[in-house]
Amino acid sequence: MSEHKKSSKIIGIDLGTTNSCVSVMEGGQAKVITSSEGTRTTPSIVAFKGNEKLVGIPAKRQAVTNPEKTLGSTKRFIGRKYSEVASEIQTVPYTVTSGSKGDAVFEVDGKQYTPEEIGAQILMKMKETAEAYLGETVTEAVITVPAYFNDSQRASTKDAGRIAGLDVKRIIPEPTAAALAYGIDKVGDKKIAVFDLGGGTFDISILEIGDGVFEVLSTNGDTLLGGDDFDEVIIKWMIEEFKKQEGIDLSKDNMALQRLKDAAEKAKIELSGVSSTEINQPFITMDAQGPKHLALTLTRAQFEKLAASLIERTKSPCIKALSDAKLSAKDIDDVLLVGGMSRMPAVQETVKELFGKEPNKGVNPDEVVAIGAAIQGGVLGGEVKDVLLLDVIPLSLGIETLGGVMTTLVERNTTIPTQKKQIFSTAADNQPAVTIVVLQGERPMAKDNKEIGRFDLTDIPPAPRGHPQIEVSFDIDANGIFHVSAKDVASGKEQKIRIEASSGLQEDEIQRMVRDAEINKEEDKKRREASDAKNEADSMIFRAEKAIKDYKEQIPETLVKEIEERIENVRNALKDDAPIEKIKEVTEDLSKHMQKIGESMQSQSASAAASSAANAKGGPNINTEDLKKHSFSTKPPSNNGSSEDHIEEADVEIIDNDDK
């Protein structure tokens, strides 16, 4: 979009597991931007089909016939090691393998793609949606992540933004964004809980809001609990029921599984509004006796029973979040429901039980996070005044000390930005160096927490054990990404690192992916233009052949031959895989000759009218009401081939043309 000027807007993007959404501030209000397909959310799906890369709705449409090359729910893999995703691998039809550094990566047609690259494709789609609406090139964004994402996952999300060509001004938690959207116009002090059950993750955040200050008091959650898991229990139920009925196991049939996935998602959504739903999947498989059809009825009560253990998993994080905030349920003034799964009646009932009040359903759970991200973009861009956001880190940070113990420096739910320092010493006499192992988690032993970085402080002057003073400092920015330093107080020697995601990408890898994305963007654009031109040519052939068939008796034979020649020209260009310019040229030529059909018929109609007028005195007296029953249509037939558009031969002369 180089022809556009650079926009000053900072867009807000909710990069969701199932769907994504983009919003922007306009006239002091956050506006959700509709995609080119006319939807306010876009499926977070990327598919590879031949040389084509599909993103969003087109990718979702072809998933049933191309499951192994259709990548959905990839957010569950971002910033994670292959060794950490065994259970997630079981639920997806595509290939997940181990990358060069042990990261989880996807393999399609022998080529590896990182979750960051796939996330970047979705972000690029969001960027293009915003650019099409604003008419300007967008370069800056606020992107949301689950509140309980660790540092690796946050940093990897930021990398995805860079690959998409975005300067990510801030990474903010989804519940915090939702609270911004809810509270931006509220007066007075309130304590609110944001219950966010989305497609792949669950978060609960407790906030205090008032006078433009949004302070996160605590956050908790489960990054492995979401709508995908609710789909999965329905899929397993369908597989078991079908096996009982037909003796056939559908669990190894990827194409059938994709159909079951779509059916489960549809049933889940329907059961939020009705007490039972029919699941019909004809020709789901076949055996020696012929095709088999799946036809089942799922009631809301059955679904709630299947999903009971999943709903139960939301309770503990809520209780912990209240405890960390030093509040009880009765202290909460309002509970916001966020994420598509929060529409499930049993989930809403659980929220009511936990907090002792009806949850607030006044926000759109699919859009509120993107709206909040846009508001934060407005704050950073100076468009929104008098708003201060005080967020927290979701997990404790510390280092490994003697005995394999994790010593915590920054407790979870500490408000950020923040800086914490602590003095440590050596464990042996004349120890020349120390290795600082940086950890994230809540377990007492280092091995049970996530290692997110390590570095060495060397050249420590010889001294008895316990004498050297090593100052370790944690400096955490507003994005929740941090720097760690270690300094020998006596010598002043210091070593520091910016904690990059341990499952993240190196700078050279990011730069390569940025270049690849830009190159692919141009190639994708050319492929799309080629596809559009071929589709238009094919459609023009169909319309021309139909017009000849319908109007052959009413247009000159010379015109029929001219059109038939040009139909052949277009057909040959398609068959020979001619350059796009050539295909466009012959298609345009055919289109111009198609217009001559209407011109010819209008000419004939005018001649007939003139003839009728000349003979009006001696001609028969025709009732105009009878004439209307035998009207000519000079418009070309519609693409649907409806017989209503065909010309009828008039069995009367037209004597009056004024009613046209």
Swiss-Prot record:
Q: Could you tell me where the Acidic residues compositional bias lies?
A: 646-660
Q: Which SUPFAM superfamilies match?
A: Actin-like ATPase domain, Heat shock protein 70kD (HSP70), C-terminal subdomain, Heat shock protein 70kD (HSP70), peptide-binding domain
Polar residues bias (residue ranges): 633-642
Phosphothreonine is carried by which residues?
T201
The biased composition feature labelled Low complexity covers 600-614
Provide any one GO MF term from the record: ATP-dependent protein folding chaperone
Pfam families in the record, alphabetically?
HSP70 (PF00012)
Q: Which UniProt keywords apply?
A: ATP-binding, Chaperone, Nucleotide-binding, Phosphoprotein, Stress response
Family to which this protein belongs: Belongs to the heat shock protein 70 family.
**Miscellaneous comment:** Expressed early during infection.
Tell me, what does this protein do in biology? Acts as a chaperone.
Query: Which protein, by its recorded name, is this?
Result: Chaperone protein DnaK
